[in-house]
Amino acid sequence: MAWSTRTMMSLALYTCFLWLLTSGLKTVQSLHDSHRGLAPTNVDFAFNMYRHLSTLDPHKNILISPVSVSMALAMMSLVAVGSKKNQFFQDVGFNLTEISKEEIYQSFEKLSHLLSKADSSLEMRMGNTMFLDQSLNMRDSFLTDIEHYHESEALTTDFKDGADAREHINRHVETKTQGEITHVFSDQDSPAPLTLVNYNVLKGMWELPISPENTRDEDFHVSENSTVRVPMMFQSGVIGYLHDSEIPCQLVQMQYLKNGTTFFILPDEGQMDAVTAALHRDTVERWDKLLTKRLVNLYIPRVYMSGTYNLEDVLEGMGITGLFTNQTDFLDISQDPPQKASKIVHKVMLQLDEKDEPPVTTTEAPPQTTSEPLTLTFNKPFIIMMFDSFTWSSLLLGKIMNPA
């Protein structure tokens, strides 16, 4: 049976909530096992969004944080009202006769708390800030609901002066991300009287150190007719590797210390679209089973990259509606609704660079391999997937068309 994008999104969010509400006082191990079972449906929604963005501009870099998008959508459910509120909850898979709004909000607060407290060297600064026009007389119940979210807040600003509003928003997010994200809005962008900014900054410490001394400037082939010079990092070690016989690609699985894991997928020449079309949960499950440990000489570009998206436009393009768009939709949260509605901005920043740290001491014997080292060079467009193995959340999904 073929499932629509909307159905896949519903399953992803609903199963995530169901797990959180029933987890109770489970141990870390049972938490890990339970979330492993829920991960596939969450991956489906991420791939659907990724494929949609790919069709908009096949030659453009893509960088999204699926778990952050889910949190932003849940937060925006606070402001959808009337029939649109009901439609929105149906779109994301909720039955309000079986689960209350309070339980939904508490569930996402728990997930955010788990991600922020996970024992991992993956540095992540994730949050949501809602900026409200200071002329709005917001209902106390709405502001109280906003405070239910861990790492979420509601701030007022003057939207009459668009330049001042942009500066206020940009400065606040820059502070929250410790200078990593500096321009959520450019001079050409206009925030709405209710603007939600969802941000995620991702860095990490490799399990196997990458020395900056081995980094060299090398060619990266953006296309047949375009080549750029990029800092190419080098690492040699025993890692998970697969040359897929069905999908035209090679891939490696890299570990961050403790709970972070990343897949780097290198399509064969001219096969990016074919690999993108094949990205499904079954594909990831098959890769996980077929990966084998072997000695790899790996060359991969240093990456400092960001992605910015208007989520309302993206979701509308995916056929997902239900968020408010006009003045009457504000009546449930404000006594003085504005003429213009909302904007949801999703901003992601990724840093993949050298971390010349000593290896982690372990009592486990290293995997044995007798094969000759394989050389794999990511010198053309590739795909990256990043997960937190403690909560089994999809932290990042991206397509690197040009790392320069």
Curated annotation (Swiss-Prot):
Tissue: Expressed by the liver; secreted in plasma.
This protein's domain notes: Proteolytic cleavage leads to an important conformation change. This reduces the affinity for steroids.
UniProt-listed CDD domains: serpinA6_CBG
Binding positions (cortisol): Q253, E285, W392
UniProt record similarity statement: Belongs to the serpin family.
An annotated Gene Ontology molecular function: steroid binding
Keywords assigned: Glycoprotein, Lipid-binding, Secreted, Signal, Steroid-binding, Transport
Location in the cell: Secreted
GO cellular component term, pick one: extracellular space
Extent of the signal sequence: 1-30
InterPro entries reported for this sequence: Serpin_CS, Serpin_dom, Serpin_fam, Serpin_sf, Serpin_sf_1, Serpin_sf_2
Site (Conserved cysteine within steroid binding domain): C249
Chief site of localization: secreted
Glycosylation sites: N95, N225, N259, N326
Protein name, per record: Corticosteroid-binding globulin
Described function: Major transport protein for glucocorticoids and progestins in the blood of almost all vertebrate species.
